[in-house]
């Protein structure tokens, strides 16, 4: 048995791609996208029909020029998501514009718009996860959206404070970023590349997993942003793991035996009192890595959203 097949016995495998061929090949349960992956898909010649459909939709809907560009961007996000859903049995994660990450109200409105676009084409909201950056504002947005049966994937999660706030707000799923945490420590010369046992990205997910399971939180943990298969295998047993096609291929080609490393405890303890907003902000800001990587992630996803809109601005 190859390692990918073996890993599927311990964790639900999710494809971190918008590439249909890769999704068909590796047969994941779910798939995740982000602004960078959507931009990559739009830039591919094979997806120009989706671009044309989005432009036609935006023009037909009308309105101000800037609104048409935004409508085209939202439309292609959903159309690519629908195409992926044809190939998987589970969820597609579609991301809200990162520039809205500090507005609860704006994030809620955009999430509802995305869900409406899916439902207009016959896709139930119970197959879509709305991706939001794990800011306080978006965590609160996810809490409200869940009341309308809109489930969210809180992404760009780097600090334990973010993880706690998500669990305490009963959000559906979090995506702690293993690789980006690892990258920061490497860039600061604080870590040897060869010593996985002290990989802070892996340690972070293990800590979150143990905490969630100890206190019986229902929020799903989906390890994300991997740099090598060793990070993935170290987290075997994590609820979900979202993996790029390059690493899925490597797992499929390896046959070395793997064991389950993460498993829930046999008993559950009473959880602590939830963090207040002030406590959350203080705790999160004690972690220099998390502060930098969250802001970098929001900023870079925002840049890719602008690049996507620039493509449509030339077509509308």
UniProtKB/Swiss-Prot annotation:
GO molecular function terms attached to this record: transaldolase activity
Gene Ontology terms describing biological process: carbohydrate metabolic process; pentose-phosphate shunt
InterPro entries: Aldolase_TIM, TAL/FSA, Transaldolase_1, Transaldolase_AS
Protein name in the entry: Transaldolase
Function text: Transaldolase is important for the balance of metabolites in the pentose-phosphate pathway.
Major localization listed first in the record, in broad terms: cytoplasm
Organism: Buchnera aphidicola subsp. Acyrthosiphon pisum (strain Tuc7)
Gene name per UniProt: tal
Organism lineage: Bacteria, Pseudomonadati, Pseudomonadota, Gammaproteobacteria, Enterobacterales
Keyword Aminoacyl-tRNA synthetase: no
Pfam families in the cross-refs: TAL_FSA
Recorded metabolic or biological pathway in which this protein acts: Carbohydrate degradation; pentose phosphate pathway; D-glyceraldehyde 3-phosphate and beta-D-fructose 6-phosphate from D-ribose 5-phosphate and D-xylulose 5-phosphate (non-oxidative stage): step 2/3
EC number from the UniProt entry: 2.2.1.2
């Amino acid at each position: 048995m190859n390692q990918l097949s073996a890993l599927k016995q311990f964790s639900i495998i999710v494809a971190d791609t918008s590439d249909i061929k890769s999704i068909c090949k590796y047969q994941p349960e779910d798939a995740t996208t982000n602004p960078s992956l959507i931009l990559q898909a739009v830039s591919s010649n094979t997806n120009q029909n989706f671009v044309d459909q989005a432009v036609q939709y935006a023009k037909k809907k009308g309105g101000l020029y800037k609104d048409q560009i935004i409508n085209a961007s939202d439309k292609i996000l959903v159309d690519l998501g629908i195409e992926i859903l044809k190939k998987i049995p589970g969820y597609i994660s579609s991301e809200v514009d990162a520039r809205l990450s500090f507005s609860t109200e704006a994030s809620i409105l955009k999430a509802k718009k995305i869900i409406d676009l899916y439902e207009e084409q016959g896709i139930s909201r119970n197959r879509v996860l709305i991706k939001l950056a794990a800011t306080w504002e978006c965590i609160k947005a996810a809490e409200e959206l869940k009341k309308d049966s809109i489930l969210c994937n809180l992404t760009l999660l780097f600090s334990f404070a973010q993880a706690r706030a998500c669990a305490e707000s009963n959000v559906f799923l979090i995506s702690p970023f293993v690789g980006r945490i690892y990258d920061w420590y490497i860039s600061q010369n604080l870590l040897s590349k060869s010593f996985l046992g002290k990989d802070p990205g892996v340690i972070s997910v293990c800590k979150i997993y143990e905490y969630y399971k100890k206190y019986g939180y229902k929020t799903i943990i989906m390890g994300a942003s991997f740099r090598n298969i060793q990070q993935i295998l170290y987290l075997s047993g994590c609820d979900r793991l979202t993996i790029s096609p390059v690493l899925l291929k490597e797992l499929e080609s390896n046959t070395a035996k793997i064991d389950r490393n993460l498993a829930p405890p046999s008993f559950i303890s009473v959880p602590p009192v939830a963090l207040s907003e002030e406590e959350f902000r203080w705790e999160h800001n004690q972690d220099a890595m998390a502060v930098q990587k969250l802001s970098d992630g929001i900023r870079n996803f925002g840049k890719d959203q602008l690049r996507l809109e620039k493509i449509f601005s030339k077509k509308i």
